[in-house]
Amino acid sequence: MIKVCGMREPDNIRAVETLGIDLMGFIFWPKSSRYVSERPAYLPTHCKRVGVFVDEDLETVRRIADEYALDYIQLHGHESREYCAQLNGLKLIKAISVSGHDDIATYKTYEGLVDYFLFDTKCPSVGGSGQQFDWSVLSAYDGSTPFLLSGGIGPDDAERVKAFHHSKCIRIDLNSRFELSPGLKDVAALRKFLNEIHRK
């Protein structure tokens, strides 16, 4: 299953949605170059909407979740277990930044509170770095919560993605390596990649 994150432009949203993806992400962190500062004229109706937040106050998260009819809230900051618990009633994806084996254990703080984890590359900013981490460290993940594989997956990685296996990996997350500019996805590149992913 596929998530495309960092969407913003109405025509681009519509075009990417037609590719048959499962989740589409919108970034509500003002410091991001993909920040959604105003409601796009078109929002997807045939895939789930994910709102990405970074250490945002709870009231703002709930307000935006309602305004955009978000299906999932992705937390990409240093949110605590208590913070997650206060978002009861909302489906949660907790991002975990990874540079090595030791980072994987962070999931234990959130196990049982979130619907999915998202393992992304640790970087000075928050996601969207275009860099990959060593996926082999995910062998250390022995939790019960399904996860998304993220972090620098690009047009040339289809075979590598197909070769990666973990019983709890159910989705991949695509963003910066498929962009023409921040927030604008290369639809042709995405289509080609998805065709390769689904080819037997």
Predicted regions and their residues:
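Conserved N-terminal beta1-alpha1 strand-loop-helix module at the mouth
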Residues: M1-K200
